[in-house]
């Protein structure tokens, strides 16, 4: 268990109304088996994909999600919970089953990315934990992947610790950013916890602490000859910064060491080109340029289109906070429950006055369809008892507009929801996070190659097809006809 998440293992890490509902279910004798879906309705950043992250952290927490004696005492002090219910909570733990997409997978609106099978009270109490962990990490992994793609898959240095929302926000963001494509972090605790390469150069305060910029660079190069990246914009990038960097860099080269420079202000497009010329003319074509300063995927894309000769990108605020979007819109909705009369599982559906908030009823699976070239062509949401097979033509329907449909024969089919926990326990041995996040990151990079570039555009991406099967469409319509 990672240190920064230990406090969240208390089952008090839930919205208060989950507990008031739970007591209501307990009093009504309604703790029967149910199924909940986690899905989302819209990609963040007006994008064409999202990167699923946080499920491994979530499962770690679920495995020890209990009420301590002090937790129960706190609830008793609220004056609304009965002693019998509080006794029930003393033995509470998650004993259900969890299905989910693999971490690092690309995910799309409407499809269930997590499915929970549990007794009603358990399923209700764990809602906040699941959404808290998966929403934030998915947001940051998605943002980072967009930054990484905008850079042309160059090195992305995560510099966000000081701008992140608290310690947990910084730690979760560091983890998710690595899954999304960052190659290193300035967060030293994150580097230790997750086995991510630690990275950092110097601040302006280093330069200002010496009588001259040249002396500051010389001192740094003497201490860190194999990792000298000079911040060249403290005074004047072109008149002094780059010239002093070249003077010190020449000595490093003579000793067999390379060096780089960092730009943190000004017209990055212009300055990076001028700095590149200076470095090349001085005989250092392999000296590298790193830039920072409130970067976003849009800014990076614009700099790339201007021909800015940047080798790596230090991205902080906008990557670890989500920038223009502060949250991911994952929701947790019941899709099936036990019929008290028959004891069998029956589908349920939220219809809503807003058609876009209607849910898909029943226990469902998700299949990803691929063509003969191994390219993803669409995701299909089907009922649990349906099997989508390769080489067979099916008709698939728009999840909101029943008269829109298409037919497709897949060359290969991948089931996306996989059983990860049974009886509240992980299936298989837990993989430590330093190894797990590398598996998740590789899954992200592998899946990116299976999606056409049109889905990955930063602006105006093509919409990837997510459809429902004919049987699910018919079930959904049967509910709608009654209201």
Features from the language model and the residues they span:
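Hydrophobic residues within beta-strands of alpha/beta enzymes
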Residues: 199, 261, 289, 311-313
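Short coil/turn segments at secondary-structure boundaries
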Residues: 73-74, 142-146, 160, 456-463
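Buried, small/hydrophobic-residue-enriched core segments of structured protein domains
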Residues: 1-33, 42-44, 80-81, 86-284, ...
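Short amphipathic alpha-helical segments
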Residues: 55-57, 139, 436-440
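Short hydrophobic "strand-cap" motifs at the C-terminus of beta-strands
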Residues: 292
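Gly/Ser/Thr/Ala-enriched C-terminal appendages of enzymes
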Residues: 2-32, 36, 41, 45-47, ...
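Alpha-helix initiation/capping motif
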Residues: 15, 54, 67-71, 75, ...
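N-terminal, Lys/Arg-enriched amphipathic/low-complexity engagement segments
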Residues: 30, 34-90
């Amino acid at each position: 268990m990672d240190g920064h998440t230990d406090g969240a293992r208390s089952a008090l890490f839930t919205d208060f109304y989950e507990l008031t509902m739970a007591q209501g279910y307990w009093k009504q004798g309604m703790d029967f088996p149910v199924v909940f879906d986690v899905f989302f309705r819209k990609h963040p950043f007006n994008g064409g994909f999202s990167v699923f992250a946080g499920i491994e952290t979530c499962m770690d927490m679920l495995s020890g999600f209990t009420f301590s004696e002090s937790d129960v005492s706190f609830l008793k002090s609220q004056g609304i919970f009965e002693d019998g219910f509080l006794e029930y909570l003393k033995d509470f733990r998650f004993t259900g089953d969890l299905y989910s997409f693999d971490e690092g997978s690309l995910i799309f609106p409407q499809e269930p990315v997590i499915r929970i099978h549990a007794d009603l009270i358990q399923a209700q109490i764990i809602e906040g934990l699941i959404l808290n962990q998966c929403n934030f990490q998915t947001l940051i992994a998605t943002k980072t992947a967009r930054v990484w793609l905008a850079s042309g898959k160059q090195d992305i240095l995560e510099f966000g610790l000081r701008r992140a929302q608290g310690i947990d926000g910084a730690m979760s963001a560091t983890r998710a950013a690595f899954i999304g494509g960052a190659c290193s972090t300035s967060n030293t605790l994150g580097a230790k916890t997750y086995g991510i390469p630690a990275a950092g150069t110097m601040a302006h305060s280093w330069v200002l602490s010496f009588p001259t910029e040249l002396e500051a660079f010389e001192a740094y190069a003497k201490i860190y000859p194999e990792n000298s990246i000079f911040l060249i914009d403290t005074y004047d990038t072109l008149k002094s910064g780059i010239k002093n960097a070249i003077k010190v860099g020449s000595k490093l080269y003579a000793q067999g060491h390379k060096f780089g420079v960092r730009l943190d202000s000004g017209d990055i497009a212009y300055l990076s080109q001028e700095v590149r010329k200076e470095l090349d003319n001085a005989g250092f074509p392999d000296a590298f340029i790193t830039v920072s300063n409130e970067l976003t995927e849009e800014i990076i894309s614009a700099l790339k289109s201007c021909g800015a000769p940047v080798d790596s990108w230090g991205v902080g605020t906008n990557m670890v906070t989500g920038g223009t979007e502060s949250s991911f819109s994952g929701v947790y909705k019941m899709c099936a429950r036990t019929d008290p009369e028959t004891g069998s599982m029956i589908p349920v559906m939220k219809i809503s006055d807003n058609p876009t908030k209607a849910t898909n009823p029943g226990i469902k699976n998700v299949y990803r369809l691929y063509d003969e070239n191994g390219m993803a062509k669409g995701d299909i949401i089907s009922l649990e008892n349906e099997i989508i097979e390769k080489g067979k033509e099916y008709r698939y329907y728009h999840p909101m507009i029943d008269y829109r449909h298409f037919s497709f024969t897949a060359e290969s089919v991948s089931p996306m929801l996989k059983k990860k926990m049974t009886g509240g326990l992980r299936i298989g041995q837990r993989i430590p996070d330093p190894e797990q996040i590398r598996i998740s990151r590789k899954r992200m990079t592998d899946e990116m190659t299976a999606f056409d570039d049109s889905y990955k555009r930063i602006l105006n991406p093509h919409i990837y097809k997510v459809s429902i099967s004919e049987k699910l469409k018919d079930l959904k319509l049967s509910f709608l006809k009654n209201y």
